Amino acid sequence: MTASRLWLAVVCAIVASLGGVQAKADPGAYVAGEAPLGGRAAQLDVYSPAMGRVIQNRVLAAAGAGAPTLYLLTGAGGGADGISWWDNTDVRDFFADKHVNVVMPVGGAFTLYTDWIADDPGVGRARWETYLTEELPGVIDGALGASGRNAIAGVSMSASSALDLTIRGGSRFAAVAALSGCPWAADPLGITMVSAQAARGGGNPGNMWGVPGGAVWREHDVFANAGALAGKTIFLSAATGLPGAADRGLPMPPLETIAGACTAAFAGRLGQLGIPATYVHRPTGAHTWGQFQTDLHEAWPHLAAAIGA
């Protein structure tokens, strides 16, 4: 099938599904616009009732219906800054022959992809947990004829978000990959790191989860709530911060050194709980997209097996 015919098939599936999307998505999310990006890639603009606005999503559609879906979250800038899986890695080529839909939301800078308890002057209305676990999957399943089996992956800021969303999403995600993150929230280290990320975007951490270290922060502390990951397929990776052959772009050794220590401790926590996980500790890697691309390639077979890709 030619690329143009594949794109036409995707568009037809979207158009045909619009009448049923309202019933499948919760509550009332829908495709507000679409545009081809070449081959089976498209931009789908999805209206989020929770946030009261349209969210861009870059989508790599599988060649046929019935494929599972990988939700691929980017780092602190949310992808709107031109720094993302789409912009800085080979995702389009890598997934071209894979039986999976890949969805890359654009936005959510410095929000941790969570539901903020109050609107914020810096980040606006952030209800990303609701969007990613309740609104967007129904739209994607209806538009692309997806199987309903999902995995999620995050990197850097969104690594802990991916784990948190897997816990809080119940059966929504069968598998998760957390690459170079730090899944703490409610202890002094977690409070410092989470607050710093929110502040980078001009946000008030109190508008995110209330009083730092309080009840809502504890609800989102992945380390403390790790037991809820039982039964999920889990892939963890991080490096030492020492630049290596895979690194491309600006290396950030201190960030990766911290992520490496956090990830090692979290892998140990899962081991203590008897929860299986694949943990890759790289001797080199400095928090760059070259490293993250390598990690995603290694994570994929584990995610694929869990969702039937």
Regions found by a protein language model. Give the residues of each.
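Non-catalytic cap/lid and distal C-terminal segments of serine-dependent acyl enzymes
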Residues: 8, 20-309
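Bacterial N-terminal signal peptides that target proteins for export
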Residues: 1-8
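Hydrophobic core
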Residues: 12-20
